[in-house]
Amino acid sequence: MAKTSIKLNSGYEMPLVGFGIWKVPVDKTAQAVYDAIKLGYRQIDGAYDYTNSKEAGEGVRRAIEEGIVKREDLFITSKLWNNYHKHEHAIEMAKHEVDTWGIGYLDLFLIHFPISLEYISHSKMPYPCFWPDREKSRSTPLQYTPVAETWAALESLVKTDSNPDGILRSIGVANFRAQLLTDLWGSAKIKPAVNQIEHHPYLVQPQLLAFLKDHGIAITAYSSFGPQSFVELDHPRVSKVEPLFTHPTIKAIADKHGRTGAQVLLRWATQRDIVVIPKSNNVDRLKQNLDCVSFDLSDDEVKQISDLDCGVRFNDPADLSPPIYIFD
C-alpha cells in the first residue's frame, strides 16, 4: 500500500498530500475545501494572511456535519503573520485564527516568515500584509522581535499532558534557513515539527533538506510547480525559465508513467517524504494530485528532476520595496 502520511516529531500523523488554499478566492473557499475533503483530502493548508480562514472553516464544518469525516480525521494548518511576533500578539493571533476556523483546534501552526513587523491590531486593519495601508504608500517598519519570544508564545498553546486545553497540536516554521533553526533549536522546549519551504526542481535546496532530515523536522513544499504558481502574479522570473509542465525532462518521465506533469512533480517530492499542498480549482486535477502517491519514480528519474536545480526562488521578500533579506 502506498505511503500516504508521515509521522511528525510531535507524534501526530501528517498527510503527504494536502489542499493548499493560498490564492483560493474568498467566495469560493468554503466550497473548494468541502469538495477537496469529499474527494479524499485530509489536510488543508491555510494561513491568516490568505484571508480565507473563516470560509475554509465553513467548508470543514460542512464536511463534518454531513458525516464525510470526523474532526480527528483532518489535519488543518494555519500560520502566524509577521505583525504578530511579540509574545502577547502571537498568542492573540493564534487564538483568533483558531476561533476563525471554528473547528476547536489547529493541528499545525507555523511562523509564516522569519520577519517581525510592527504590530497592527486586527480590529484596525485586518490582513495588513507588508503594508499598513491598502494603497501600499509606505512599508510597515520592522519590529525586531526575537524568534525565541514568538516561539515561546506558541509553545504555551500546545496541547500537552500539563496543558490539556492547548489549542495547537503541533507547531513549526516556514521559510526558515538552517542557521536560524539552529538558534531556535537551542532554546526551544518543543522542537519545530515542520518547516514549510519553497521547493521545486528549480529550487531544490539539498543542504537545507539534509539539515531538516538530520534534525527530525518534517518538510512541507509549497509552489511545487515552480513558476506556474506565480504566473498570475506577473513575477519577473517566471518568463526566464521553462514552465515545468512542458519541460522535456518532466514530459518524458510523465509520458513513460502515463501520468501528468503535475503528478510527476508531486511524486518527486512525496517519494522523498516531503509533504505537498497543491491548489487547483479543477476537480479532475484535484483527483490527479491526490493520486500522486500511487506510482513510483526510479532513482534515476528522481535525480534527473533534481538536476534541474538552478537556484531560482520565486517567493522572496527581497523583491519587495524596500527589500527584506531573509535568504541571503
Swiss-Prot record:
Pfam families: Aldo_ket_red. Induction: Overexpressed during growth on both D-xylose or L-arabinose compared to D-glucose. Significantly expressed during late stages of infection of barley leaves. GO terms for molecular function: aldo-keto reductase (NADPH) activity. It is an enzyme of class 1 (oxidoreductase). NAD(+) binds at residues 174-175, 223-232, 279-289. The active site is at Y50 (proton donor). Keywords: Carbohydrate metabolism, NAD, NADP, Oxidoreductase. InterPro entries: AKR, NADP_OxRdtase_dom, NADP_OxRdtase_dom_sf. Pentose reductase with a broad substrate affinity involved in pentose catabolism. Has highest reductase activities with L-arabinose and D-xylose as substrates, and displays much lower activities with D-ribose, D-galactose and D-glucose. Has highest dehydrogenase activity with L-arabitol as substrate, followed by xylitol and D-sorbitol. May be responsible for the first step of the L-arabinose catabolic pathway. This is NAD(P)H-dependent pentose reductase.
